[in-house]
Amino acid sequence: MSLIGRPKKYRMIRQDPKVSFFSPRGRPGRPDQAILTMDEFEAIRLADDLGLSQKAAAGSMHVSQQTFSRILKKGRKIIADAMSHGKSIKIRGGFYVINTQPENPTQAK
């Protein structure tokens, strides 16, 4: 059986997150989990933490601006769901490669 569609492109991530698990306080027992992929984490870091434009952030991740926008929207939705429902957030997985080469993130390719 063959796969239909275009193969997925690797997303470029600059670094592993320092913390890969967040849990709400005041919630007894083990809360449900929301999984945030590494590319979603990187998109949120670039757009919301560093304040880059979508064009510049997309260039940094080596994806199109439309793909970046989709990744960012999905990541924000996961975080909003986790916060609204008291879920823990685990950062793992995704289709990514860690690129440690220095690059000026304000210049889009």
Predicted regions and their residues:
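DNA major-groove recognition helix of helix-turn-helix
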Residues: 72, 79
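The alpha-helix within a helix-turn-helix
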Residues: 47, 58
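Intrinsically disordered, low-complexity basic tails/linkers immediately adjacent to helix-turn-helix/homeobox/MYB/SANT
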Residues: 81-109
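Short, Lys/Arg-enriched N-terminal segment that forms or immediately precedes the first helix
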Residues: 18-33
